[in-house]
């Protein structure tokens, strides 16, 4: 019974407290809402949003201006535009929007639609596309002192002069110029909130990095008007991140340039030197077409990568011309060209030593011919036969001499015809001391004379072919030496061209 009475007392007291507190809270909230309603009526009852918020016409509205960048969306090199997502921080004082917080339930600030109050007509002067002014009219923050704080977001496309000299290792200087479009400095003046762009809320770009972003205050007199107009100009120094272009453009271009060097190491006999040159030239043409789609169409400067591609295309074109010349030299013969002495001395003697080229000696000069050699008189052909075979053949010859017809008018020297298991063999006979009567009695048959003439013809033909082959080999070696000269020359030029590609942006501090 006691517990029930205590519980009843507790719930009774709780109910009484609720009856006392809830109306008080509701009354306070209602009075606060009522205070804001009264404040709105007080402020905007006779408010004119088209008049400047100054007590006197000669007074100047001071607008404090600042810029906060949220994102660097894009830099269009071809159309020379920079697209940014920014917040325009603006602050000014409107004397018609002041109140005493004590009279309005201690309300110190209000959020009011920006369409209801006077706002400065600050626009982007160097706008390239889209709206010059802010399109999304957010609410303004109004304080009891009359201070209005307005931070509308905007996406601007500002014109930017793109310098592609060191593309893709380039650094661009873009600007955004803000100012009042209709009010001159006597009506509205600007002050900078900060000397730099606010990067606290900046979202990093995957292609560009903001190196520096500062603002300056300027006053300028334009040709259209006699008044002076103030502006705040923000200068952005942005640097391209070159990894994408290095992997997809520069490295393939360098590799293709190296293929040009291999053209001079490719043997002329393979018949693919011209094909390789043309393939490299077509590949470079494709890369040049890709670059023309990226960089702006300007005749002021040529981008560094464009210069390198143009240099490589000239490089490849020269390699085609040189390859045609080398192939022409390679296929020369004694019947078409005579080798000048200076070519023989320079390209067969001195230059190969400078290039560390060692030409192997031909087998004839190393070991001599194992099967065939000429007699000192160049009239007889002697084979390398065994002494036993010669003696047997001489005995057979003596037996057959009885059946040989005798003719007159033979030469002074004698000749032996040897028949062995290897076929017909001729050898030079040692001159013997014979009397005139014996010399006049040595006769040969017409068949043997014809055979000897055929052997002489074959020997002369072989000597001529050996001489022609030697000259052809000399021309081929000259072509090889010319190839080696341009191989080293093109390696040096390719190396210097690559250094020339990376050195200027490196010295400029862009790499």
UniProtKB/Swiss-Prot annotation:
Claim: Translocase is one of the keywords in the record: no
Residue ranges, Cytoplasmic side: 330-484
GO molecular function annotation: acetylcholine receptor activity; acetylcholine-gated monoatomic cation-selective channel activity; heterocyclic compound binding; quaternary ammonium group binding
Stretches of the chain found on the membrane's Extracellular side: 28-241
Pfam families registered for this protein in UniProt: Neur_chan_LBD, Neur_chan_memb
Bilayer disposition of the protein: Multi-pass membrane protein
Disulfide bonds: 160-174, 224-225
CDD domains named among the record's database cross-references: LGIC_ECD_nAChR_A2, LGIC_TM_nAChR
Cell membrane as UniProt keyword: yes
Glycosylated residues, chain numbering: 56, 106, 212
PROSITE patterns cross-referenced by the UniProt entry: NEUROTR_ION_CHANNEL (PS00236)
Catalysed transformations (reactions): Ca(2+)(in) = Ca(2+)(out); K(+)(in) = K(+)(out); Na(+)(in) = Na(+)(out)
Top-level taxonomic group: Eukaryota
Cleavable signal peptide: 1-27
Main location (coarse class): membrane
GO CC terms, sorted: acetylcholine-gated channel complex; cation channel complex; cell periphery; intercellular bridge; neuron projection; neuron projection cytoplasm; neurotransmitter receptor complex; nucleoplasm
InterPro entries hit by this protein: Neur_chan_lig-bd (IPR006202), Neur_chan_lig-bd_sf (IPR036734), Neur_channel (IPR006201), Neuro-gated_channel_TM_sf (IPR036719), Neuro_actylchol_rec (IPR038050), Neurotrans-gated_channel_TM (IPR006029), Neurotransmitter_ion_chnl_CS (IPR018000), Nicotinic_acetylcholine_rcpt (IPR002394)
SUPFAM superfamilies: Neurotransmitter-gated ion-channel transmembrane pore, Nicotinic receptor ligand binding domain-like
GO biological process, one term: response to acetylcholine
Role summary: Component of neuronal acetylcholine receptors (nAChRs) that function as pentameric, ligand-gated cation channels with high calcium permeability among other activities. nAChRs are excitatory neurotrasnmitter receptors formed by a collection of nAChR subunits known to mediate synaptic transmission in the nervous system and the neuromuscular junction. Each nAchR subunit confers differential attributes to channel properties, including activation, deactivation and desensitization kinetics, pH sensitivity, cation permeability, and binding to allosteric modulators.
Subunit structure, interactors included: Neuronal AChR seems to be composed of two different types of subunits: alpha and non-alpha (beta). CHRNA2/Alpha-2 subunit can be combined to CHRNB2/beta-2 or CHRNB4/beta-4 to give rise to functional receptors. The alpha-2:beta-2 nAChR complex is proposed to be a heteropentamer with two subtypes: LS (low agonist sensitivity) with a (alpha-2)3:(beta-2)2 and HS (high agonist sensitivity) with a (alpha-2)2:(beta-2)3 stoichiometry; the subtypes differ in their subunit binding interfaces which are involved in ligand binding.
Protein name (record): Neuronal acetylcholine receptor subunit alpha-2
Annotated organism of origin: Rattus norvegicus
């Amino acid at each position: 019974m006691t517990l029930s009475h205590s519980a009843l007392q507790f719930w009774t007291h709780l109910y009484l407290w609720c009856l006392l507190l809830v109306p008080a809270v509701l009354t306070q909230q209602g009075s606060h809402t009522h205070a804001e309603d009264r404040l709105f009526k007080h402020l905007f009852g006779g408010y004119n949003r088209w008049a400047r918020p100054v007590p006197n016409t000669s007074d100047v509205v001071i607008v404090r201006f600042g810029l906060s960048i949220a994102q660097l969306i894009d830099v269009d090199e071809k159309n020379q535009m920079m697209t940014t997502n920014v917040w325009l921080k603006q602050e000014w004082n409107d004397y018609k929007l002041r109140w005493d917080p004590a009279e309005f339930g201690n309300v110190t600030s209000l959020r009011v639609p920006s369409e209801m109050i006077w706002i400065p007509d600050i626009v982007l002067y160097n706008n390239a596309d889209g709206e010059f002014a802010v399109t999304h009219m957010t609410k303004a923050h109004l304080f009891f002192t009359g201070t209005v704080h307005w931070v509308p977001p905007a996406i601007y496309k500002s014109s930017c002069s793109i310098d592609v000299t060191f593309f893709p290792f380039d650094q661009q200087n873009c600007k955004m110029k803000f100012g009042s479009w209709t009010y001159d400095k006597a009506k509205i003046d600007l002050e900078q909130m900060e000397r730099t762009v606010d990067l606290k809320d900046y979202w990093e770009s995957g292609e560009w990095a903001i190196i520096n972003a500062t603002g300056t205050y300027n006053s300028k007199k334009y040709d259209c008007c006699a008044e002076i107009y103030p502006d705040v100009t923000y200068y952005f120094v942005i640097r391209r991140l070159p990894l994408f272009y290095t992997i997809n453009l520069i490295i393939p271009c360098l590799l293709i340039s190296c293929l040009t060097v291999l053209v001079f190491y490719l043997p002329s006999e393979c018949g693919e030197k011209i094909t390789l040159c043309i393939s490299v030239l077509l590949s470079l043409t494709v890369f040049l077409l890709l670059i023309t789609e990226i960089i702006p169409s300007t005749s002021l400067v040529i981008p560094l990568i464009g210069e390198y591609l143009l240099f490589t295309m000239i490089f490849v074109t020269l390699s085609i011309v040189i390859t045609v010349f080398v192939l022409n030299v390679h296929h020369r013969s004694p019947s078409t060209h005579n080798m000048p002495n200076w070519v023989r001395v320079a390209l067969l003697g001195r230059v190969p030593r400078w290039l560390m080229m060692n030409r192997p000696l031909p087998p004839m000069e190393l070991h001599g011919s194992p099967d065939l050699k000429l007699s000192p008189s160049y009239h007889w052909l002697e084979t390398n036969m065994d002494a036993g075979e010669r003696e047997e053949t001489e005995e057979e010859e003596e037996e057959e001499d009885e059946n040989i017809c005798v003719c007159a008018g033979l030469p002074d020297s004698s000749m032996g015809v040897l028949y062995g298991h290897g076929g017909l063999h001729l050898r030079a006979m040692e001159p013997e001391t014979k009397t005139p009567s014996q010399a006049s009695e040595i006769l040969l048959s017409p068949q043997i004379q014809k055979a000897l003439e055929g052997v002489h013809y074959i020997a002369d033909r072989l000597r001529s072919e050996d001489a022609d082959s030697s000259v052809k080999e000399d021309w081929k070696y000259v072509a090889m030496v010319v190839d080696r000269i341009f191989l080293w020359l093109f390696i040096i030029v390719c190396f210097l061209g690559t250094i020339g590609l990376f050195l200027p942006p490196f010295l400029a501090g862009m790499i």
